[in-house]
C-alpha cells in the first residue's frame, strides 16, 4: 500500500467511516508516530553533538602535530592517549546506535488496506526498538563527551 493510500484509509477511519474502535486505533497510530517524531528530533541533535566531539577528538588523537601531551610526563601522556581513543570509539559507536533511529520504517501495513491491531503492534515494536537504540546512543555520547572534557582538562592542567 502506498503512503497516499495509507493516508486516505486513516483519514476515512477518523472522519466518516470509523467506529469508536477504529478511531482509537487512529489515535494510537498518531501517538506512536508522534513518539517517532520526538525520537527523530532528539537523535538529530545527538548526531550533531557526536559530530562535533568526533571531529575534535579525531583532530587531537589522529593528527600527530597537535599532540597536547608532547611535553607531558609518560603517565599523563598514556592517560591522555587512552582517554582520547576510548572517547573517540564511544562517540563513533554512539553514532552507530543513532543512525537506525532515523531510518524509514517499511512494512508496517500488510497487503490488506486498513488499520488493525497488528499494524499498531508493528509500529509499537518500531517505537520500542528505536527508543532502546536512542537510549544507548545517548549513554555512549555522554560517555564520549565526558571523555573529551577529561581529555581537554588533562591537556590544560598538566
Language model features by range: what are they?
Residues 1-3, 16-18, 85-93:
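Phosphate-binding glycine-rich loops and adjacent basic patches that engage nucleotide phosphates
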Residues 2, 19, 44, 73-74, ...:
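Serine/threonine-rich low-complexity intrinsically disordered regions
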Residues 2-11, 95-103:
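Short, compositionally biased low-complexity segments
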Residues 3-28, 110-118:
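Short, charged cytosolic
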Residues 27-30, 34-107, 135-158:
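Alpha-helical transmembrane segments and their immediate juxtamembrane boundary regions
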Residues 28-29, 35, 113-134:
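Short membrane-interface loop/juxtamembrane segments of multi-pass integral membrane proteins
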Amino acid at each position: 500500500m502506498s503512503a497516499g493510500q495509507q493516508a486516505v484509509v486513516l483519514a476515512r477511519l477518523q472522519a466518516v467511516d470509523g467506529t469508536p474502535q477504529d478511531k482509537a486505533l487512529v489515535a494510537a497510530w498518531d501517538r506512536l508516530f508522534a513518539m517517532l517524531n520526538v525520537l527523530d528530533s532528539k537523535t538529530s541533535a545527538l548526531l550533531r553533538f557526536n559530530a562535533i566531539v568526533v571531529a575534535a577528538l579525531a583532530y587531537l588523537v589522529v593528527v600527530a602535530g597537535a599532540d597536547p601531551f608532547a611535553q607531558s610526563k609518560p603517565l599523563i601522556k598514556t592517560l591522555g592517549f587512552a582517554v582520547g581513543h576510548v572517547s573517540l570509539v564511544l562517540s563513533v559507536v554512539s553514532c552507530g546506535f543513532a543512525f537506525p533511529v532515523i531510518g524509514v520504517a517499511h512494512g508496517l501495513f500488510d497487503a490488506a488496506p486498513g488499520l488493525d491491531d497488528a499494524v499498531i503492534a508493528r509500529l509499537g515494536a518500531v517505537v520500542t526498538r528505536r527508543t532502546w537504540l536512542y537510549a544507548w546512543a545517548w549513554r555512549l555520547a555522554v560517555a564520549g563527551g565526558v571523555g573529551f572534557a577529561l581529555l581537554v582538562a588533562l591537556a590544560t592542567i598538566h
